[in-house]
């Protein structure tokens, strides 16, 4: 496939997502209407796919897409685009209506800080900076990310499952979780909202109707399919990198949501080679 057709395919995918998510053509009400929403989204997606800086992403847009945009425009877009827009775009990548089996888990992304060589030279023993926490929900059968939430500081994973469940475009019938998500209030909330949760019971936890059911009738063959979420985390880090360059929460959300969106719609570095 020629380079021109690949460029048109990327533009068509992004514009189709924006229409499906009901995102306006312009994100600001006042001021000059110079760059449409799809231009900003393409620039931020390309930055994550190629793992570029903002300057090089703007230069690539100018050379291959004939879009003359300053790199600070992309920086401001990453900072100002609300999290709801990114979640709407991620939900727009899901074209199926039913999710039989889903899984939720968390992972971490390192911050781009001093290198290990520099740390060794200054005789630093302790770690510098805290990793970015990512908690996501995936469709096990389709291998797609349904929802995600990201934090610059550590948060309780079990408390975010209800948030992921509400943001998911489809309601999963069964949700697989590891032992860290075992909480009776969470199991009850999921049952009330049409999802049966499967998670191993914590040690020395005896109270709770759902926990008693899991202790007596745990389906381990079904539970081990939860490993698919670990495979998706591995693929995400191998394709788009293991580190985060941004420091502020809005820009961290933009970086990680762009990676999830690019993965769901099949944008890889090898598709542009």
Protein language model regions, located:
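Major-groove recognition helix of helix-turn-helix-like DNA-binding domains
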Residues: 67-83
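Helix-centered, glycine/charged polyanion-binding patches within enzymatic domains
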Residues: 174, 179-246
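DNA-recognition alpha helix
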Residues: 54-67
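Basic, short loop/linker segments at the boundary and entry of helix-turn-helix/winged-helix-like folds
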Residues: 2-48
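Charge-patterned, long linear interaction tracts outside catalytic cores
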Residues: 247-273
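Polybasic low-complexity intrinsically disordered regions
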Residues: 30-41, 46-49, 83, 87-192, ...
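Short helix-capping/linker segments at secondary-structure and domain boundaries
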Residues: 50-56, 240-244, 265-273
């Amino acid at each position: 496939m020629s380079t021109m057709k690949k460029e048109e395919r990327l533009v068509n995918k992004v514009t189709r997502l924006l229409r499906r998510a009901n995102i306006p053509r312009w994100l600001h009400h006042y001021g000059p209407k110079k760059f449409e929403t799809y231009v900003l989204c393409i620039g931020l997606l390309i930055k994550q796919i190629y793992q570029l800086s903002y300057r090089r992403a703007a230069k690539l847009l100018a050379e291959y897409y004939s879009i003359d945009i300053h790199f600070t425009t992309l920086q401001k877009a990453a900072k100002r685009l609300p999290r709801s827009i990114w979640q709407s775009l991620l939900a727009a990548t899901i074209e199926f209506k039913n999710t039989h089996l889903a899984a939720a888990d968390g992972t971490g992304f390192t911050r781009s800080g001093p290198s290990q060589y520099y740390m060794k030279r200054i005789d630093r023993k302790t770690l510098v900076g805290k990793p970015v926490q990512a908690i996501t929900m995936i469709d096990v059968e389709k291998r797609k990310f349904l929802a995600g939430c990201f934090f610059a500081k550590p948060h309780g994973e079990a408390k975010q499952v209800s948030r992921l469940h509400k943001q998911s475009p489809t309601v999963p019938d069964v949700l697989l979780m590891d032992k860290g998500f075992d909480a009776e209030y969470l199991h009850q909330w999921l049952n009330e909202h049409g999802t049966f949760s499967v998670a191993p019971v914590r040690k020395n936890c005896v109270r709770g109707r759902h926990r008693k059911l899991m202790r007596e009738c745990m389906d381990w063959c079904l539970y081990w399919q939860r490993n698919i979420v670990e495979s998706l985390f591995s693929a995400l880090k191998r394709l788009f990198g293991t580190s985060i360059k941004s420091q502020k929460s809005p820009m961290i959300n933009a970086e990680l949501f762009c990676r999830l969106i690019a993965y769901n719609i099949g944008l890889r570095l090898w598709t542009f080679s």
